[in-house]
Amino acid sequence: MEGFFWKTLLVVGALAIAGTSSLPHKPLIYEEAVDLAVSIYNSKSGEDSLYRLLEAVSPPKWDPLSESNQELNFTMKETVCLVAEERSLEECDFQEDGVVMGCTGYYFFGESPPVVVLTCKPVGEEGEQKQEEGNEEEKEVEEEEQEEDEKDQPRRVKRFKKFFRKLKKSVKKRAKEFFKKPRVIGVSIPF
């Protein structure tokens, strides 16, 4: 009978130890997650300047113990410090006309090791594009007026000039779009 008691106690103890689950990652509060995301951006983006957190609003759904996906939303601004200097972000002031980046990130805690994916793009980009388009339209009007002044040129020359202006405008627009694509960074996090 005494042997049965010890065997039962041993089995119950083994089940109790095996039954306790530990998280595959350490609990991560929202502020730590955002700080980690900014640090990852600074180390992996290829930018010359460091970026520092400007604003982050904790979502109501953030669960530091969750094993599911978690979402981040924050903005950061370019600082006067260069990446090559390897200085602490607390020492770096914001650039007066520094770029403000709007970022969305996802932590995938279900992966082993956990993975974070960040997508950042300049804030106010759409407003700048509209302003640039307005400026380009003004330039076109000026160019058309200039063409009218050059009435003594053959019609063929005018058509070629107009065609090449449109081509130049299209190339500039596509080049700007290409270089303003959002930066996407994905890394695994060793916890």
UniProtKB/Swiss-Prot annotation:
This is Cathelicidin-related antimicrobial peptide Bf-CRAMP. Residues 23-161 form a propeptide. Expressed by the venom gland, stomach, trachea, skin, muscle, heart, kidney, lung, brain, intestine, spleen, liver, and ovary. The keyword Signal applies. It holds the Pfam family Cathelicidins. The keyword Secreted applies. Residues 134-151 have a biased composition (Acidic residues). It is found in: Secreted; Target cell membrane. One of its GO terms (cellular component) is membrane. Keywords: Antibiotic, Antimicrobial, Cleavage on pair of basic residues, Disulfide bond, Fungicide, Membrane, Secreted, Signal, Target cell membrane, Target membrane.
